[in-house]
Amino acid sequence: MFFKKVKKADLEAVSSRNADQERQENKMMRAWISFGVVIILLILLFFASINIGSLKVGFGELLSGLFVKYNKDVATIYDLRFPRIIISMLAGAAIAVSGVLFQAVLKNPLADPGIIGISSGASFTAVIITAFAPTLYFFTPIAAFAGGVVAFFMVYCLSWKGGLSPMRIILTGVAVNSLFTGLSSALNSMSGGDRTGVAAIVEANITQKTWDDVTTLLPYVVAGLFLAMLFTQECNLLSLEDKTARSLGVNVNVTRIVISLVAVLLASISTAVAGAISFLGLIVPHIGRILVGSNHKMLIPFSAFFGAFT
């Protein structure tokens, strides 16, 4: 009788392990399918966006005009539409991954570069350069990054009270966001510089963007996404209690600051070039967790693709 009970318990344990393994395999399958669908949709969106407007070309004509023989219509699309499409995709990817990193660092599911004031801080310093020193346009991304860092540490310090409270972070972030948004509006009204450039930053308008803006944005976004992928394991560990993370060998404070700087870089640079984009960094990570899970090794690259699509 005793051996029958032991055998039954062993069979139940094996059955439970098999069920868990099957669930994990199903999750991984769903994650890879989600990756494939988003990548396909992103490619389709890219080619569909090329033909949005009065000027339209076929796919074969586009390839021929790009690589074989000069075509006036294709050249126009290449000069005008390609930069806007690429900038919107790069900025979307950067903002989405920035949201993932902020939510991991702050342990707050509502953390978003726009909500907690990072985008408005970056926008403010970018507006200063654009409005009063347009000849220093090359330094706009650096100025935006500095503004984003200042905004982040304002939120971090003002919301700290024996620890980080999600509610205090959001309330402080809203206040910092309002402060920098008001300052940007004031600078816009009193500046004598490039009003169009200032409006483009504040309103996220990419209609005037060129290949120069692409070359400005691309290296920063690629570097930021590469750094984000280097910290996937740390992001997973930061989701644990700080004591647990420290016991696993993580220097919590230093790791939190470094990952925050990567998130600020992504959000600030995209804001400087494409303008302030709200809620993308909030929504995309949550959709990503539903589709691919909470493991940042999957969540970060998926959010980049889905943010570019969105």
Residue ranges and their predicted role:
Residues 2-310:
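Alpha-helical transmembrane segments in inner-membrane proteins
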